[in-house]
Structures are given as C-alpha cells and as structure tokens.
C-alpha cells in the first residue's frame, strides 16, 4: 500500500525549494552588477560638443575685472515682501438656533383644602346639684269623692225591682246551662277525665280568655277546638288548634288563653291529653 506524505513534510520540502530558487536569482543579479562596474566608459560619442579657446579671448586686468565682474552673478533684486493684506473676516453666519419649544405650563395643582380645625370640645359643665324636691303627692280628691258616692249608695237602700231579680235568675240559669254544655262537650272530647278536673280547666281558661276588639268590631264569632298536654309536673305542652270555624284572630286568642291560664291548671297524677272547645259569641244576655 502507498503511504502519502504527511502535510508537515510537504511544507518543509516546498520551503526548501523556494529558498534555493531565490538564492540563485540573487547570485545572478549580484554577479551582473560587478561585471558592469569594471567595464571602461567609452569616449565621447558622436553628437558631443567640443570646447575651443582663443588667445584673443584673454584680455587685460580690466577685462579680467570686467569679466570677473561680469562673471559675478547678478544679484537678483530682492522682492519686497508683499504686505499681507488683512484678510477680510467673513461675516460669521449667524447660526439661528432652533427656538426651544415652549414647555407646557404645568397645570396648577389644586390647593388642598385646609382641614377644618377640630372644634374644641366644650368642657363638661359641672352638673348643678339637684336638690331633691319632694314631689307633692297628687291629691286624692277624686278617690275620696268616689268613696263618698259608694258610701251613699251603700247607705241608701237599693230599690230592687222584680225585673232585676228575673234578669239575675236568667243569667244564672244561662251560665249554668253554658257551663253544663261546655263540660258535656268537653267530656265528649275527653272521655275518661273527671268532670271536676275539666271544670277547673275551663274556669281557668275563661278567666284568662279575652274577646279581641277587632273581632267584636267586625262581628266575628265562632268556636275553636284547642288541644294540649298537661304533664305530671304541671307543665303544659303541645298547644295547638285542632278544629276551627272562624278566623285567625279568634284562633290566636284561644291559644293565648290556654298559655296564660296554664299555671292555673290542676296537676294531674299522670300526663293528660285534653281537647277543650272555646266559643266566642256576641249575643247579649
């Protein structure tokens, strides 16, 4: 296999060859220069001018002087130095500087409003000593007058008429009938409960029951059936309207009557669930 020479070897060979060629050229040139200096210069060649001298040309001293004087080179008149004319200064061109753009005037800042000075708190004035003035008790003149009138009525014998007696008897009979009717109706709703217990419950409710004025003005009547539970400790719970044939005004009045009369109910031996009808009527006796 052929091995190609390395690039380093090739570069060395090329440099050596170039050195030898340059050395040979310098040697040839130097030899030519030496040979040219040793060669004699040729005589005047054709076309050269001959210089001839005659004796007549030699004159006396005067001539020599004149010749010498003439030989002297004429001094050229010195040139007067030219006055340097003052250079006219060229008028400088006024460079007009560009006018600066007017800066926009800053907008005047709004002056901050002066904060209102806090008003000095008024010093608390010393409270004037309040002299305890005994309030004059209102005169009990009207009460005394009422008491006198009652005393007169008591002292004066009442004239009882037969009509009044009849009315009182009718009222008692009607109240007995209503109580009997109420107890009988209550017994119908509460079987197994004693009449005495129911009577106490009804009397307590009637003592706290109020006929609402709004219902009276509107002429509202009706009956509300209320159920509730009396516990052994005397507390009353689960109060609600079971049945009603009237408006919410009387329903609310019936519930309030049970709540306000609860503390008057007798304590049962065991927990009792009751249903009590409460009637509202505008009929006069």
Swiss-Prot record:
Keyword annotations from UniProtKB, A to Z: Cell inner membrane, Cell membrane, Membrane, Protein transport, Repeat, Signal-anchor, Transmembrane, Transmembrane helix, Transport
SUPFAM superfamilies tied to this protein: TolA/TonB C-terminal domain
GO molecular function, one term: energy transducer activity
Bias type Polar residues, positions: 55-69, 178-187
One Gene Ontology cellular component annotation held by this UniProt entry: plasma membrane protein complex
Any Gene Ontology biological process: transmembrane transport
Subcellular location field: Cell inner membrane
Entry-linked Pfam families: TonB_C (PF03544)
Periplasmic-side segments: 36-285
Membrane association type: Single-pass membrane protein
InterPro entries: TonB, TonB-dependent_transducer, TonB/TolA_C, TonB_C
Transmembrane segments: 15-35
Domain TonB C-terminal: 196-285
Cytoplasmic side: 1-14
Comp. bias (Basic and acidic residues): 71-97, 112-156, 164-177
Feature: compositional bias, Basic residues: 98-111
Region (Disordered): 55-187
Predominant cellular place of this UniProt entry's protein: membrane
Keyword Metal-binding: no
Summary of the function given for this chain in its UniProt record: Interacts with outer membrane receptor proteins that carry out high-affinity binding and energy dependent uptake into the periplasmic space of specific substrates. It could act to transduce energy from the cytoplasmic membrane to specific energy-requiring processes in the outer membrane, resulting in the release into the periplasm of ligands bound by these outer membrane proteins.
Family to which this protein belongs: Belongs to the TonB family.
Protein known as: Protein TonB
Organism: Helicobacter pylori (strain ATCC 700392 / 26695)
